[in-house]
Amino acid sequence: GDDGIAVAMALAVLDDESLPHPPIEAVITVDEETGMDGAMGIDVSGLKGRRMLNIDSEDEGVFTVSCAGGARMDCVLPVRREAFAAPVQRITVQGLVGGHSGTEIDKGRGNGVQLMGRVLASVAEETELRLVEVCGGLKDNAIPTGAQALISANAEVTAEVCRRMTQSLREEYRVTDPDVEVTVEPAETAMLPMDAVSTRRAVCLLVCHPNGVQVMSADIPGLVQTSLNLSLIHISEPTRLRCIS
């Protein structure tokens, strides 16, 4: 990828004594994809150079004159739990294409975590729903390809809503995600469901969380200036729902 190409180019220049150039310092850091932890922790006091070339293109000989900034938001929602007399079921949203949250956020592809919120909201419109657990996403820089949720609700109503949601989402995402699917099956869990208030708050978080392109560049046609990706959600402990974007 782009990081490996950059390291190879820097090492090749350092290794070739026939190339004319001013003094060069090569700075190589780790964890660029998952939060730039290496760059954040580097001690620059020993560097003498005052100009930096950021080699972050995927083609040899191409230099990108820019710098992409990013911030990670970690949101924790406290939840309460109580018993609820309805069967437990597992809802799965799957079949999405996904992609890189930086280079492919403008493709209009479905976000599995946010679509799960829409499914849960649709179930809640037709029957009493209690959320037990929800999880989705693999990396904070990847568009989620799916999500799963354990719920307590009327089984027949839930099955019908999931069937309709599959049809609706396949029509909505027929170009970008034609294989999207919503399934439901019986499940078991020892965890109590969230209460009504916590369920509503959790579903609202998934549905209303900003996601996708927010602002396009006014200077460069087709360039995304600001975007958000609802990348990860899970129960970090029984009384805490955590999402990352």
Predicted regions and their residues:
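A structural signal for small-residue-enriched, beta-sheet-centric alpha/beta enzyme cores
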Residues: 99-106, 135-144
